[in-house]
Amino acid sequence: MTDTGSFRYSNTSSKTHRIIAELIDIGIKPYEMHTKIYETSSIEDTNLLGEALQTMKLTEDGKVAWLWVTKDMLKKTKASLEGTEGIINFARSIGGVEIAILFRETGTDERVKVSFRSKGKVDVNKLAGV
């Protein structure tokens, strides 16, 4: 069982856990859900991850990591835009990194979606509002 942050963020409440307890009580198996969510990936999405990781850069002090996914990368790997969702977590998992940023080209226009994640010391919601 999980929520979007795997129960690790401050907005995870006791209500969240009560809902999960109810799901377990009706027969949902946590191991099976975990496997389906975290241990299942398509080859296309895995190839996209490899492409994206090759774009990663760090600030000199190693506290900020950023990477990007282009429309060409999506086309080359035949991955879906949904396949980009967990990529930012690889940047955030690097030791010393406090802020991770993912730039994603979306759709047929020239828009770029920017996602921020932090380990908690920095309120990235303020950055996202800029």
For the regions a protein language model found, what residue spans apply to each?
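Catalytic-core segments of class I nucleotidyltransferases/pyrophosphorylases
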Residues: M1
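Hydrophobic helix-and-loop "lid/oligomerization" segment in the mid-to-C-terminal part
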Residues: T4-V130
